Amino acid sequence: MSLCERAASGSALLWPRVLLFGDSITQFSFQQGGWGSLLADRLVRKCDVLNRGFSGYNTRWAKIILPRLIRKGPGMENPVAVTIFFGANDSSLKDENPKQHVPLDEYSANLRDMVQYLRSVDVPRERVILITPPPLCEAAWEKECVLKGCKLNRLNSVVGEYANACLQVARDCGTDVLDLWTLMQKDSQDFSSYLSDGLHLSPMGNEFLFLNLCPLLDKKVSSLPWLLPYWKDVEEAKPELSLLGDGDY
């Protein structure tokens, strides 16, 4: 039997998956220096980091599409970690942005429903990380709104209400949570440098999110092995002894 035939007849090498689910702040996270790309680099040869960010989406729409993204599967097909990062659009002011706005109570219910759905497809709460929306720099975002011909359609105080609701859902459901809204404003610091336009993350904001998310994510993936041996550990005379079967890790 050839080496190719032996490899084909053996077990498939499955990469554990970390799934990032959110709005534009997640969609843009794979740009250069983005928090998603930083995670992918940190977890290389341990996990595939999947970007499932949808610009402009809110929890009302997210709840509908989640079952299309994650379904019950055997073992390693289930994500080892899932981030749920919504609220920046839900917290839009109803009068100024009714399409994206989601009432606070519904926002909480949608987050709960998504956590419950994940549990139903064998992604337990211990694998889930909720992330609150970041604070809003109203002065910078108002300039963006004016350029688009509309009024200021978000307020930081309102975003804070949604952040608090996200925290409460995490407490109720027993998931981890990253309180980005509070951390970026800690000790009344100027958080504007964390944002590129008052709403989305700047390079500094991406790094801030990455550094604060890592401790939560490490609890879920630190025990995972490096996939396939280090090159110096590959058997020189018969590399298949290292690269097939039990030599995967």
From Swiss-Prot:
Keywords: Hydrolase, Lipid degradation, Lipid metabolism. GO terms for biological process: gene expression; lipid catabolic process. The keyword Lipid metabolism applies. It comes from the Eukaryota. Probable lipase. Belongs to the 'GDSL' lipolytic enzyme family. IAH1 subfamily. This is Isoamyl acetate-hydrolyzing esterase 1 homolog. The gene is Iah1.
